[in-house]
A protein has these predicted regions:
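Active-site metal-binding motif and surrounding structural segment of the metallo-beta-lactamase
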Residues: 39-57
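C-terminal cap of metal-dependent C-N hydrolases
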Residues: 321-324, 377-427
Length: 427
């Protein structure tokens, strides 16, 4: 039946809504009405609306960088556990990376993936295919065929296209069929064997470093190619102040988009402390100046998107020495709460944060998600933005517990999450 919510703080950047109001969801799970005009005075008298007491309603989050273990690594995460973890964090749409076993690089594996997603997932899954066969960085995959099968974008995920000739061929193909390509911007030669950001901490811990120039040089290269070959190009994750400077300069010349991981927005290399493998990330955490520059980059609209970079790893692969430990952190459940920290400490406006988590990613992907437009699926979350809680890995829903923020106090928690008008998560 119909559902009525009133007295909510609604933030929907796509429709420029930022007001106290209500939401009406039809029997079909679509949005019928929204905003300040929805209140007790104009509801049918027999209806009992749910009073949200000024809690927030946000569009369901769109997370552009998520690793799921299917196929091949189901012991780390599968579609069912990913869905439940995502829903608890207000995420209703995810873009999945092709770094699976086998790699998502051909039509038959896409069919399998879509079947699994349809059967097991409660959220919207938008799969990526790899740019190159088996993510080896040599032969291109068949963009045209894969796009027809419903692939949303192409990326080698954790790997970079190192060869500039191959990259220009990729860009030409992308331009021809209008598909989106996403680059993990890190020159693999300059970053070779690196574990954490180059600098004082790396030296102190005796770990080989990943210099900031590895990122910058690759961005410079790709944006130079992009001037010649205009295609839909997205830099997956920025991590340094210098990269922001490059982007600021290039934005005036050429059209592209970029993202940042919540890890790089919230943490810096000092958090690694005494070899904490849970903070071995890619791109690495850098200096506090870099973190501040990334926050400023969002403020200045140089960076478009915040991602969780959710990469579940089992205990075994993190309990190794730093150099042997797997890279990545589980983050989809804490993405929104950790992002809200930037609102609570006055770094960013609430609207800027929500835009980077909802309408901006949807716009880049060209999907009609991340908004609360009338007639659209009612994918949204109800959030108490002031509710304090502490991250405890045993409480996490994801199959893998490799959070980068164990024991951190956060402010702001998702209370309910709805997909197509159905409540699929309740705190």
């Amino acid at each position: 039946k119909k559902q009525f919510f009133i007295n909510a703080n609604i933030v929907d950047p796509h429709n420029s809504i930022n007001e106290i109001g209500g939401l009406i969801i039809g029997e079909d799970g679509k949005i019928e009405a929204i905003g300040k005009k929805v209140n007790t005075n104009n509801l049918p008298t027999r209806e009992k609306p749910i009073d949200l007491k000024e809690k927030h309603i946000f569009p369901g989050l769109v997370d552009m960088r998520v690793f799921v273990g299917e196929p091949g690594y189901e012991y780390k995460e599968n579609f069912r556990t990913l869905s439940d973890a995502a829903l608890s964090g207000g995420v209703t749409s995810v873009v999945t990376m092709p770094n699976t076993d086998p790699v998502i690089d051909n039509v038959s594996i896409v069919d399998f993936l879509k079947r699994r997603g349809r059967d097991k997932s409660k959220i919207n899954i938008f799969p990526c295919a790899s740019l190159t066969k088996n993510i080896e960085g040599t032969n291109m995959t068949e963009f045209g065929l894969l796009q027809k099968k419903g692939i949303i974008a192409f990326t080698d995920g954790t790997k970079t296209i190192q060869n500039p000739r191959l990259m220009s061929r990729i860009m030409n193909s992308a331009k021809d069929i209008g598909c989106l390509i996403m680059q993990h911007a890190e020159d693999s030669e300059l970053a070779k064997n690196g574990m954490i950001n180059s600098g004082i901490i790396a030296s102190k811990l005796g770990l080989s470093g990943i210099p900031e120039i590895a990122e910058r040089i690759l961005i410079e290269r790709d944006l130079t190619l992009l001037e010649k070959i205009k295609c839909r190009y997205h830099i997956s994750q920025l991590s340094s102040q210098k990269s922001i400077e490059v982007i600021k300069h290039r934005k005036e010349i050429v059209k592209f988009t970029s993202g940042v991981s919540i890890n790089n927005l919230s943490l810096n290399e000092n958090d690694i402390g005494d070899f904490r493998t849970f903070l071995k990330l890619s791109p690495p955490l850098r200096r506090e100046e870099d973190r501040i520059a990334l926050v400023q980059g969002l403020k200045d609209e140089l960076i478009d998107v915040i991602v969780s970079d959710h990469k579940p790893e089992d205990e075994e692969s993190k309990r190794l020495t730093f150099s042997q430990a797997a890279t990545g952190a589980s983050g989809i459940e804490t993405l929104l709460s950790l992002s809200l920290e930037l609102y609570h400490n006055d770094s960013l406006k609430l609207e800027t944060i929500i835009k980077a988590l909802t309408s901006n990613p949807a716009k880049i992907l060209k999907i009609d998600k991340g908004n609360l437009s009338i007639g659209n699926d009612a994918d949204f979350c109800i959030v108490d933005i002031n509710k304090p809680w502490i991250v405890k890995k045993e409480k996490l829903i994801s199959k893998s517990k490799n959070t980068s923020i164990e024991d951190k106090k956060l402010q702001g928690k998702v209370i309910n999450t709805f997909v197509k008008g159905k409540e699929l998560f309740k705190l």
